[in-house]
Amino acid sequence: MNPETTGASPALFAGETPRDLTVADAAALTRSALVSRVAPIMVGSAAASYGSRTREVSVIGSTADMLEVRHWKLAAGGFLPRGDWGRGATVCVIGEKIRSELFGAGPAVGQWLRIGDWRFRVIGVLASEGRSIGVDVQELVVIPVASAEALFNSQALFRVLVEARSREAMPRVTQWVLDTLRERHQGE
């Protein structure tokens, strides 16, 4: 683990599964017609800097589906690119407070932000709104899940968000997710 960054294995911490959830587990959950979106989540913290300004930030590694699954809005720019979850693009989306503290009155979109030992191009700014997975959205930096795996030197996900195609499908999707993970984790 990089000494400047900390990632967690909250799947074990939360007591939900005896084995870490991985991106491969999350990808397996996309294989049901009843599932509309899947967003793997890796969490950690790291020092972020732009110019002479530095601060500790909460980092979420995820996919393009995170925007819709969490019902987030953008204040500027775009969100994570769609595509191969295993490709760690060096792009990020930042919360409004991060934008304000690190970039001041200047534009953030298009600038390079250093997170730990990595440089990420800012492609979007999240609109100010509430909390998500216990963290103020204004204080988040969101990067592709593969980039988070490299940044935190870990493959353990915090959790996987799964969105059913309809409210009626939720019980079947829940059972399908449990069965799929049980099969992938040899009954655990």
Language-model-detected regions and their locations in the chain:
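Proteins with a high burden of low-complexity, intrinsically disordered sequence enriched in S/T/G/P/A and R
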Residues: 1-9, 61, 77, 183-188
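Mid-to-C-terminal secondary-structure elements
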Residues: 64-84, 88-187
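Hydrophobic, regular-secondary-structure patches
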Residues: 1-58, 65-68, 82-83, 100-101, ...
